[in-house]
């Protein structure tokens, strides 16, 4: 008993401890599986926060704004390049997704309000919580003031908006996680991670980018050691078959490798290059050594180079190859070229532009030598450019302050929408100007994970006590109506996207579905399962549209319920 009183006092006086405790317990809960269902750390944090909130904790709402801004800015920054590339007629499906969910959400709310005789305040609250669109509280409350009702009745209805929101918000946050992360992959019969890799490979024009710890089973470049059977060939002759002789071992000693070096019978040669070229050249040289000496190994690096040398600008790849002598190119392989947000295959007639990023592959000394000829190495710094990203967040929050009025209805992106838009813009800019705005993937991942889990934990700590109390007072009916409002529009939109819009990629589809519900917690779990930022592009499009459409539901529910 003394321990419980101590914990209550501790958490009430130190809400920051309650916040981190909710996150820790939530991610622990999120690890458990119930059949094929795993709620994940974000939903777990929300449940843990609701449980902790029962002791009565006050936590500042400003913290929730900051955490969500960090989360959504990082999401926008990761997906900015692909987002702007996707805008156009090809994004029509995402627009339709957002409209279908908003319309089906409106009719679902009106149906349950009529069937169960909810007043306008409770109906609007169920819409706000069940659809997890907090802005509906504001627009519905403003609409209630325009009805000309007595002040006491207006205030009562506005209070009912908050009650309906508090009761239904928690499951409203869980529903899109369950549907997007568990039910949608079951419907599509494909996993999020597999389709995320497929979509990324298509965006990269066949050049797949693998997640941490993932590598292709069939590597494009290989190293093999062969024992020479017949003497007489020079290194230059061997390398004419598009391979590189990296090491020569004669008897028990390594010898210097030059273009004029002549190999002798019994020499061990370390060949490096494309798999097919190495195998075909090696078979002509002699027998492959299955267990080569350790001193023959070399370290291979892969680096991006920002092309700034004017001697290469405007030239084709073939012309650039001629400018770079064979000696300068020795041992270096060009993997690809990135221009803005597009990855281009290195064909002989492709013309080079200033600012292109070329990916080189070879030994460190060879890559460094060629990089000096082309421009400058783009080193992967572990430092985050906080000047760049601090300005980005300021710009986003300022955008969120802008209010446009549609009649009596105030429309605003809010801090979250503003930070998302700013993240998209700054991510796009950084992609085109790689020297500034660096943010390591680990740093942006931390912002996404901590920002989102912290946001939902603060929400749970703020509304959890009221939600449980209201359920006790109002009964389970209101909660179940929220379940219906949360699930039915998502199911309708999911089926519409699958069978009418013909979505084929599970990761892209999941992002679009989560965005059409403005379901930020669901996005976090989708990104966790996908392992890359592919779902964010479709999410960003539907989220921006849904943020406006769902906000407009407040006055419509008040008018027609």
From Swiss-Prot:
Pfam families: Asp-Al_Ex, TrkA_C. One of its GO terms (molecular function) is monoatomic cation transmembrane transporter activity. It comes from Zymomonas mobilis subsp. mobilis (strain ATCC 31821 / ZM4 / CP4). One of its GO terms (cellular component) is plasma membrane. It is a multi-pass membrane protein. It comes from the Bacteria. GO terms for biological process: potassium ion transport. Keywords: Cell membrane, Membrane, Repeat, Transmembrane, Transmembrane helix, Transport. InterPro entries: AAE_transporter (IPR050144), Asp_Ala_antiprt (IPR022457), RCK_C (IPR006037), RCK_C_sf (IPR036721), YidE_YbjL (IPR006512). Belongs to the AAE transporter (TC 2.A.81) family. SUPFAM superfamilies: TrkA C-terminal domain-like. It is found in: Cell membrane. This is Uncharacterized transporter ZMO1681. Residues 205-287, 294-376 form the RCK C-terminal domain. Its main location: membrane. The chain crosses the membrane at residues 10-29, 34-56, 63-80, 95-117, 122-144, 164-186, 386-403, 407-429, 442-464, 479-501, 538-560.
């Amino acid at each position: 008993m003394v321990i419980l009183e101590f914990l209550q006092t501790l958490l009430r006086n130190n809400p920051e401890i309650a916040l981190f405790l909710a996150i820790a317990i939530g991610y622990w809960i999120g690890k458990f599986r119930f059949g094929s269902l795993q709620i994940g750390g974000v939903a777990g944090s929300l449940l843990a926060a609701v449980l902790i909130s029962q002791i009565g904790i006050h936590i500042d709402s400003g913290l929730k704004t900051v955490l969500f801004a960090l989360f959504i800015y990082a999401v926008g920054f990761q997906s900015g390049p692909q987002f702007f590339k996707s805008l156009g007629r090809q994004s029509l499906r995402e627009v339709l997704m957002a409209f279908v969910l908003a319309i089906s959400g409106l009719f679902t709310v009106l149906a349950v309000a009529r069937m169960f005789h909810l007043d306008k305040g409770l109906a609007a609250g169920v819409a706000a919580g069940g659809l997890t669109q907090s802005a509906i509280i504001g627009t519905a409350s403003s609409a209630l003031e325009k009805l000309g009702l007595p002040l006491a009745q207006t205030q009562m209805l506005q209070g009912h908006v908050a009650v309906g929101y508090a009761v239904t918000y928690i499951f409203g946050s869980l529903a899109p996680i369950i549907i997007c992360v568990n039910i949608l992959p079951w419907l599509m019969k494909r996993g999020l991670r597999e389709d995320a890799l497929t979509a990324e490979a298509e965006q990269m024009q066949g050049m797949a980018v693998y997640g941490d710890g993932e590598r292709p089973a069939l590597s494009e470049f290989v190293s093999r050691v062969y024992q020479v059977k017949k003497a007489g060939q020079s290194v230059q002759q061997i390398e004419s078959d598009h391979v590189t002789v990296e090491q020569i071992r004669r008897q028990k000693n390594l010898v210097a490798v030059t273009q004029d070096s002549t190999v002798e019978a019994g020499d061990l040669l370390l060949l490096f290059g494309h798999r097919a070229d190495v195998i075909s050249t090696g078979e002509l040289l002699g027998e492959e050594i299955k267990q080569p000496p350790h001193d023959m190994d070399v370290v291979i690096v892969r680096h991006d180079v920002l092309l700034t040398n004017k001697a290469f600008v405007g030239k084709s790849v073939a012309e650039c190859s001629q400018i770079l002598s064979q000696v300068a190119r020795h041992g270096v392989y060009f993997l690809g070229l990135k221009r803005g947000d597009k990855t281009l295959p290195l064909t002989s007639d492709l013309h080079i532009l200033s600012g292109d990023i070329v990916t080189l592959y070879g030994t460190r000394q060879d890559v460094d030598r060629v990089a000096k000829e082309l421009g400058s190495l783009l080193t992967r710094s572990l430092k985050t450019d906080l000047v760049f990203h601090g300005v980005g967040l300021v710009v986003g929050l300022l955008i969120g302050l802008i209010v446009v009025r549609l009649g009596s209805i105030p429309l605003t992106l809010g801090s979250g929408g503003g930070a998302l838009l700013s993240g998209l813009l700054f991510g796009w800019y950084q992609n085109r100007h790689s020297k500034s705005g660096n943010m390591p993937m680990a740093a942006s991942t931390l912002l996404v994970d901590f920002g989102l889990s912290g946001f939902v934990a603060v929400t749970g700590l703020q509304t959890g006590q009221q939600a449980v109390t209201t359920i006790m007072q109002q009964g389970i009916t209101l909660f179940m109506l929220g379940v219906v409002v949360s699930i039915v529009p998502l199911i309708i939109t999911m089926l519409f996207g699958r069978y009418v819009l013909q979505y084929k990629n599970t990761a892209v589809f999941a992002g679009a579905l989560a965005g059409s519900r403005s379901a930020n917690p669901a996005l976090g779990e989708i990104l966790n399962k996908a392992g890359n930022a592919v779902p964010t592009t479709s999410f960003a499009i539907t989220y921006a549209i849904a943020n406006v459409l769902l906000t407009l539901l407040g006055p419509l529910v008040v008018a027609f319920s």
